């Protein structure tokens, strides 16, 4: 199931982030606080099996004085290796796009990737 992340996902998101970005980049407490207070970020998760998450997507809502509307930027996409090849990243990105369209008058999405991205 693809859904918005909740504070109950903080521990799993910390583990996923450690797999994705390396250990020590954030803490469960910091993730929990961000999920509760950061109104400029949307986090989407994919449920895996056994209470684990299969992956996550982060969308930052950028605002510029030059434009009336928010510009969503997909800043993180991660799917655990054992769940890859099943279309989970595509499902999370579609969910993010549809969710943002319901809330904000969007004209486009921005996606940045690293030079070593092979997906």
How would you name each of these model-derived features?
Residues 79, 85-98:
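Conserved acetyl-CoA-binding loop-helix of GNAT-fold acetyltransferases
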Residues 24-43:
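Active-site rim helix/loop that mediates acceptor-substrate recognition in acyltransferases
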Residues 52-61, 73, 78:
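Conserved beta-strand in the GNAT
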Residues 101-113:
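Conserved GNAT acetyl-CoA-binding A-motif
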Residues 1-13:
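A short beta-loop-alpha structural element at the N-terminal edge
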Residues 64-70:
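A short, polar/charged loop-to-alpha-helix boundary motif
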Residues 90, 114-119:
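Conserved active-site alpha-helix within GNAT-family acetyltransferase domains
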Residues 15-27, 65:
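Helix-loop element at the rim of GNAT/NAT acetyltransferase active sites that forms part
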């Amino acid at each position: 199931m693809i859904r918005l992340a909740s504070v109950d996902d903080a521990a799993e998101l910390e583990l996923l982030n450690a797999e994705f970005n390396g250990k020590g980049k954030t803490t469960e407490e910091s993730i929990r606080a961000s999920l509760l207070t950061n109104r400029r970020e949307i986090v989407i998760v994919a449920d895996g099996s056994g209470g684990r998450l299969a992956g996550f997507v982060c969308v930052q809502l950028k605002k510029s004085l030059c434009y009336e509307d928010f510009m969503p930027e997909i800043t993180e996409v991660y799917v655990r290796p054992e769940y890859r090849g099943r279309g989970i990243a595509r499902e999370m990105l579609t969910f993010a796009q549809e969710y943002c369209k319901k809330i904000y008058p969007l004209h486009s999405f921005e996606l940045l990737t690293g030079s070593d991205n092979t997906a």
